Curated annotation (Swiss-Prot):
Chain's gene name: katG
Site (Transition state stabilizer): 87
GO molecular function, one term: heme binding
Species of origin: Pseudomonas putida (strain ATCC 700007 / DSM 6899 / JCM 31910 / BCRC 17059 / LMG 24140 / F1)
GO annotations of cellular component type: cytosol
Name this protein carries in UniProt: Catalase-peroxidase
SUPFAM superfamilies assigned: Heme-dependent peroxidases (SSF48113)
Cross-link Tryptophyl-tyrosyl-methioninium (Tyr-Met) (with W-90): residue positions: 244-270
InterPro entries (alphabetical): Catalase_peroxidase, Haem_peroxidase, Haem_peroxidase_sf, Peroxidases_AS, Peroxidases_heam-ligand_BS
Reactions catalysed, as given in the entry: H2O2 + AH2 = A + 2 H2O; 2 H2O2 = O2 + 2 H2O
Alphabetic keyword roster: Heme, Hydrogen peroxide, Iron, Metal-binding, Oxidoreductase, Peroxidase
PTM info: Formation of the three residue Trp-Tyr-Met cross-link is important for the catalase, but not the peroxidase activity of the enzyme.
CDD domains linked: catalase_peroxidase_1 (cd00649), catalase_peroxidase_2 (cd08200)
Length: 751
C-alpha cells in the first residue's frame, strides 16, 4: 500500500462541471457583481484621502534612484530601468479602447490575468517586482495603478524628457475584470476570429461583450477572408495577447505599408489621431531596446501557468544566463538609437537617413538593418561595453516612413524636434490619463493647468446653488408644463445613462444631450420637445435672478416625475436631488469623441438602433455593467421604467400595467402571472405576445429584454421579490435609490 495518504475528496469547492459548461450561452450576471466589497481587504478605504497624504516628491526621488539601481537578479539594460518602466506604463494604459471604454490603467489590472500573462507583457512581471520595495515603503498611499503609470512618467523625466504632467486617483481593485472582451481566439497571438468570415461577432457578458458598429455590421457578417482587414469591435489589438500591432507586420508579414494600416486602426481605437500616433511611437522608441537573444523555445510558461516556486513570475528563460544580454521578450533584437537612455530625435533621423534591408533576429523574427553595413559600431550594447552595434528597426517603425499619411508627419517631427517633444508629451499624457474621466477625479501636485478637449471639460460650477424652495418651485413648474411622466423620465434617463463606469465618461453633467452629436442620436428621438419646454422654464426662472443649469433641470424633471408617479401609486416621500451640474458648450464637446457613447441598444428604454447578432438581453447586461449596476438594481430599474412609460418612441413593449405613469410593481406581477401564455410574434424571437390562457385575448406585448426577467432563473428570483404582495414598498424604495444612483454616476464633485 502506498505511504501517501489518500485524499477523501476527489474535487475541492468550485471544481467540477459548471453551469457555464452546460449552458455556455446563459446570461452571466457575475459581471454585475465583480469588485465587490468582499474582495477588498479594506472595503471602507478612501484612496483619494490616502493619496493626499503621500509625500509625492519623496516618492519621485525614490523612483528616480531606482532607475539606475541595477539588480543582479534582473540587470538593467544600459544600466537604466527607464525604458522597461516606460513599456510597463504604456502596456498598462494601452489596453484602453474607445469602443466600450474598457481596459486602461485605471485599476491596476496589469497585475492580474490575463494581462499579467499576455505575450506582449513578457518581463513586465520583473518590472513590477523591481517596484515592490517602493510600493511596500509607501503602502496604501499609492496604488499599484497610480504607481505603474507614475513610474513611466518618472522614467521619461530621468532620461531628460519634460513630461506634460501627472495626475493620481487610480484606485486598485483586487480581482481580474470579467467584463472585458479581449477576443475569441484560444491560443496566444491568434487572430483568426477577429478578422475574416469566421469572425465571432458577439460574446456573452462574462466572456466580454461586443457591440459591433452598425456601419460595419453587414460587412462583418458578409465579408470573406480575402476582404480588406476589418478588425472586430471593440477590439484594439490585431492578435490575442498583443497591446496593438504585430511589430513584425500583419500576421508576421514584414510589409511596412500594411503595418501602417494596422497601426492606424488600433491606435485610432485607443483614441489617438495620426499625429499622436506618430509622436507616441517616435517618442517611445527614442529609448531602450527589444529582446530576442535566442529562440522562443527557451522561454517557460507565463506567470499564470508557472509553478508555485516562481512566486508569480513567469517566462523563465533557459537561454544562457536567462537575463541581461540573454533576455528573450518579443523575439526581436532591436535598438533604435545610440542614446537609448537619453531623450533625442535620433530615432527619426535614423529612420529617414538610412536605407533599410530585411534581416532576422537571433530568435528568427523579421526586423530591419541599415543597408551596406551603415551605422555599424554606433549603438552601444545593453550589457557588454566592449560591443557595438548598428541601429535597427521594426516593421512597424518603417510604417512611419512609408505610410503616406504618417510619413509627412514623421518628417516634420524629424525637422522640428521641438514639435515632436511637445506632441509626445501631450500624447503620452493622454495615453496614461484617457480612462480617468473628468478632471474632478485628478489628484496630485503635477496636474496641468491646461484643460484638454479629450477630457470632456466642463465650465466651473456656480458656488451659489439653488435652494430647497427653488427646487420645489421648479418641480411645480415642470409638472405643470404638460409633459408626461414618461417623457420626463425618458429624457432624464437619456441624459444620465450615457455614463460609462469603464472610462468615467458621459452622464448628465454638462447637458450634452442638447448638443451634437447626442441631440441627433436615434435613441434620443423625442427629447427635443422636452428640452424645449425645460429651456423655457429655465429661462423664466433665471430671469428672476437665480440660476439653474439645464443639466440640473433635466435631472430634476425626471426626479419630479418619479416622485409624482410614486405618489399616484400611494407612496409618500421624496426622491433625492443634489444640484450643482453645469452646462457644457459645443466648443467643449468633441463630436467624434462623443460619438462612441451613442447607445446602439438601450434595453432600459426598449431601444435598438438595428438588428444585431448579439441578443438584446446581453446588450442590456453590457449596458447595466457600464452603469455599474447590480442585478437587483438592473431588475428594479427595468420594472420601474416600464410602468413609468419611459420606452423609446412611446412603445408599449413591456408596459405591463393598465395605469402607465404610476410607479407600481405591476411589471413584475403581470410578467409572473401564470394565467398569461407567451409566444413570439417575430421570426427572430425579438418580440412576444402574452395571451390569456383561457380566452386567448392578447393582454401584453414584450421584448426579449422584458421576458428575460421571467425566463432567467436569477432574474426571475429577483422579480419575485418585487412582484410579491408585500413587495410594493420595497420596489419603490429600491427604484428610487437606483434612479438617484444613475442620475449621479458622473457627480465626482460630490464624491
Amino acid at each position: 500500500m502506498s505511504n501517501e495518504s489518500k485524499c477523501p475528496f476527489h474535487q475541492t469547492a468550485g471544481g467540477g462541471t459548471t453551469n457555464r459548461d452546460w449552458w455556455p450561452d446563459q446570461l452571466n450576471l457575475r459581471i454585475l457583481h465583480q469588485h465587490s466589497s468582499k474582495s477588498s481587504p479594506d472595503p471602507d478605504f478612501d484612496y483619494a484621502k490616502a493619496f493626499k497624504s503621500l509625500d509625492f516628491q519623496a516618492l519621485k526621488k525614490d523612483l528616480t534612484a531606482l532607475m539606475t539601481d541595477s539588480q543582479d537578479w534582473w540587470p538593467a539594460d544600459f544600466g537604466h530601468y527607464g525604458p522597461l518602466f516606460i513599456r510597463m506604463a504604456w502596456h498598462s494604459a494601452g489596453t484602453y479602447r474607445i469602443g466600450d471604454g474598457r481596459g486602461g490603467a485605471g485599476s491596476g489590472q496589469q497585475r492580474f490575468a490575463p494581462l499579467n500573462s499576455w505575450p506582449d507583457n513578457v518581463s513586465l512581471d520583473k518590472a513590477r517586482r523591481l517596484l515592490w520595495p517602493i510600493k511596500q515603503k509607501y503602502g496604501n498611499k499609492i496604488s499599484w495603478a497610480d504607481l505603474i503609470v507614475l513610474t513611466g512618467n518618472v522614467a521619461l523625466e530621468s532620461m531628460g524628457f519634460k513630461t506634460f504632467g501627472f495626475s493620481g486617483g487610480r484606485a486598485d481593485v483586487w480581482e481580474p475584470d470579467e467584463d472585458v472582451y479581449w477576443g475569441s481566439e484560444k491560443v496566444w497571438l491568434g487572430g483568426d476570429t477577429r478578422y475574416g468570415k469566421d469572425q465571432v461577432k458577439a460574446q456573452p457578458p462574462g466572456q466580454g461583450d461586443l457591440v459591433a458598429e452598425p456601419a460595419k455590421h453587414g460587412e462583418e457578417q458578409n465579408r470573406d477572408l480575402s476582404a480588406e482587414r476589418n478588425l472586430e469591435n471593440p477590439l484594439a489589438a490585431v492578435q490575442m495577447g498583443l497591446i496593438y500591432v504585430n511589430p513584425e507586420g500583419p500576421e508576421g508579414n514584414p510589409d511596412p505599408v500594411a503595418s501602417g494600416k494596422d497601426i492606424r486602426e488600433t491606435f485610432g481605437r485607443m483614441a489617438m489621431n495620426d499625429e499622436e500616433t506618430v509622436a507616441l511611437i517616435a517618442g517611445g522608441h527614442a529609448f531602450g531596446k527589444t529582446h530576442g537573444a535566442g529562440p522562443a523555445d527557451n522561454v517557460g510558461p507565463e506567470p499564470e501557468a508557472a509553478g508555485l516556486e516562481m512566486q508569480g513570475l513567469g517566462w523563465h528563460n533557459t537561454f544562457g544566463s536567462g537575463k541581461g544580454g540573454d533576455t528573450i521578450t518579443s523575439g526581436l533584437e532591436v535598438t533604435w538609437t545610440s542614446t537609448p537612455t537619453r531623450w533625442s530625435n535620433e530615432y527619426l533621423n535614423n529612420l529617414f537617413d538610412f536605407e533599410w534591408e530585411l534581416t532576422k533576429s537571433p530568435a528568427g523574427a523579421h526586423q530591419w538593418r541599415p543597408k551596406e553595413g551603415k551605422g555599424a559600431g554606433t549603438v552601444p550594447d545593453a550589457h557588454d561595453p566592449g560591443k557595438k552595434h548598428a541601429p535597427s528597426m521594426l516593421t512597424s517603425d518603417l510604417a512611419l516612413r512609408f505610410d503616406p499619411i504618417y510619413a509627412p508627419i514623421a518628417r516634420r517631427f524629424k525637422d522640428n524636434p521641438e514639435q515632436l517633444a511637445d506632441a509626445f508629451a501631450r500624447a503620452w499624457y493622454k495615453l496614461i490619463h484617457r480612462d480617468m474621466g473628468p478632471l474632478a477625479r485628478y489628484l496630485g501636485p503635477e496636474m496641468p493647468n491646461e484643460e484638454l478637449l479629450w477630457q470632456d471639460p466642463l465650465p466651473k460650477a456656480d458656488p451659489s446653488t439653488i435652494s430647497e424652495q427653488d427646487i420645489a418651485t421648479l418641480k411645480s413648474r415642470i409638472l405643470a408644463s404638460g409633459l408626461s411622466v414618461g417623457e420626463l423620465v425618458s429624457t432624464a434617463w437619456a441624459s444620465a445613462s450615457t455614463f460609462r463606469g469603464s472610462d468615467k465618461r458621459g452622464g448628465a453633467n454638462g447637458a450634452r444631450l442638447r448638443l451634437a452629436p447626442q441631440k441627433d442620436w436615434a435613441a434620443n428621438q423625442g427629447v427635443d420637445k422636452v428640452l424645449a419646454a425645460l429651456e423655457k422654464i429655465r429661462g423664466e426662472f433665471n430671469n428672476g435672478g437665480k440660476k439653474v443649469s439645464l443639466a440640473d433641470l433635466i435631472v430634476l424633471a425626471g426626479t419630479a416625475a418619479v416622485e409624482k408617479a410614486a405618489k399616484d401609486a400611494g407612496y409618500s416621500g421624496s426622491v433625492g436631488f443634489r444640484p450643482g451640474r453645469v452646462d457644457a458648450s459645443q466648443e467643449q464637446t468633441d463630436v467624434e469623441s462623443f460619438a462612441v457613447l451613442e447607445p446602439l441598444a438601450d434595453g432600459f428604454r426598449n431601444f435598438t438602433k438595428a438588428r444585431y447578432s448579439v441578443k438584446a438581453e446581453k446588450l442590456l447586461l453590457d449596458k447595466a455593467q457600464l452603469l455599474t449596476l447590480t442585478a437587483p438594481e438592473l431588475t428594479v430599474l427595468i420594472g420601474g421604467l416600464r410602468v413609468l412609460g419611459a420606452n423609446h418612441g412611446g412603445s408599449n413593449l413591456g408596459v405591463f400595467t393598465d395605469k402607465p405613469g404610476t410607479l407600481s410593481n405591476d411589471f413584475f406581477r403581470n410578467l409572473l402571472d401564470m394565467s398569461v401564455e407567451w409566444k413570439p410574434t417575430s421570426a427572430d424571437n425579438e418580440t412576444f405576445e402574452g395571451r390569456d390562457r383561457k380566452t386567448g385575448q392578447v393582454k401584453w406585448s414584450g421584448s426579449r429584454v422584458d421576458l428575460v426577467f421571467g425566463s432567467h432563473a436569477q432574474l426571475r428570483a429577483l422579480s419575485e421579490v418585487y412582484g410579491s404582495s408585500d413587495g410594493g414598498d420595497k420596489f419603490v424604495r429600491d427604484f428610487v435609490a437606483a434612479w438617484q444612483k444613475v442620475m449621479e454616476l458622473d457627480r465626482f464633485d460630490l464624491k
